[in-house]
Amino acid sequence: EEGNPLGVQGTQFRFAAAPPTGEDDVKKTEWQTQQVYMAHSAVTTTDNHYADEKWSRAQASLAGVDRSPFRVYLDDWQWTSSTNDLFPATLNANSEQFGYSLKLTSSAPYQKQGEQGYSTKSADGQVASYYYSQPFIDVSGEVTIDGETHQVSGEGWIDREWSSQFLL
């Protein structure tokens, strides 16, 4: 609202603790899962950097991904769309020193990384991922730092990358 530069970051990762090896790995309850979620959230001003992270196993009330409507969440840190698509969406995170509630819109085409979205990570081609970006997101909403709320607007982007193996 005042023209001061501000950076906001929300990142979520999903890891498989171990690949399924057979019938013994079949979930018997929703607490038995190989999926672990980690999220980073940050706000940066010209003078300060605020950051936090959360971890959780995949469980319906703790962390996960919903397809319809689309939602990625870890506790109250959430990317939520009203449709099956990424946009329009809201991005929310709250921490002890900072928080944000942002509206995200985009109608631009996604940008595929690598060769048509297939991104080779090693010289021998054995390590690769699928990867796309959306670098043209309109952002507006509120950012709260140390109890003071600011109206914000600007531009953002998202990267989405997935692989069948751990990427270093």
Language-model-derived ranges and their functions:
Residues 1-168:
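Targeting-peptide/extracellular-domain and disordered-appendage signature
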